[in-house]
A protein has these predicted regions:
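Active-site-facing alpha/beta catalytic cores
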Residues: 5-190
């Protein structure tokens, strides 16, 4: 789910997905999307489990990180599935990287140098979306940066990475110059 904040609903979906995985295990390996932080274009609105695990209480990142770990752990241990999450906050990576087997860099984050560089040090598949504009060159530059060695400051430390050969594209739709939605599945739209 895009907003994995209702634990029991997520677990019900996970059990169904695990049943499907069993049926197709010879053809495909399913990784469950468990997105726990929601990017917001203007910063308003509910920001997900990471921010506010209890919607009736004040936001709490400490409680949010505990809830995120708990949810990923439950999906993994109770269903046997592995999980994917959007890496909205690179600083949260050390708290969840032992549980998450696939990371996504979203459309609003893909142009950010810190996301690109942190991705270059992740030892798991990391998908880069094209930005909200749909611009593919931005996504390709992000993939290039993530696949190559980088050195940068992260969490108050100098970091050197060797590159992530598993960085790849996640295609989403976009907008053309006139603001019209364009799909991501026609060859001619991808080349435009």
């Amino acid at each position: 789910p895009c907003s994995s904040d209702n634990e029991e609903a997520v677990m019900e979906y996970a059990r169904r997905l695990a049943d499907l995985q069993e049926q197709v295990k010879d053809q495909i390996f399913i990784v469950m999307r468990v997105y726990t932080a929601k990017p917001r274009t203007n910063g308003d609105g509910y920001k997900g489990l990471m921010h506010q695990p209890d919607t009736h209480a004040a936001p709490s990142f400490v409680d949010g990180l505990k809830a995120v770990r708990h949810l990923h752990y439950r999906v993994i241990t109770e269903t046997g599935l592995t999980t994917a999450d959007e890496l909205l906050y690179p600083a949260s990576l050390p708290y969840v990287e032992d549980l998450i087997s696939y990371h996504a860099i979203g459309a609003r984050s893909v142009e950010d140098q810190e996301h690109r560089f942190v991705s270059s040090g992740i030892s798991a598949p990391t998908g880069m979306k094209n930005p909200t504009s749909g611009n593919l060159s931005v996504m390709f530059n992000a993939i290039y940066a993530a696949q190559h060695p980088q050195n940068f400051l992260f969490n108050a430390q100098a970091v050197e990475t060797s590159g992530n050969p598993l960085a790849h594209a996640i295609l989403r739709g976009g907008l053309d110059a006139s603001g019209k939605n364009i799909p991501n599945y026609h060859y001619e739209d991808l080349l435009a």
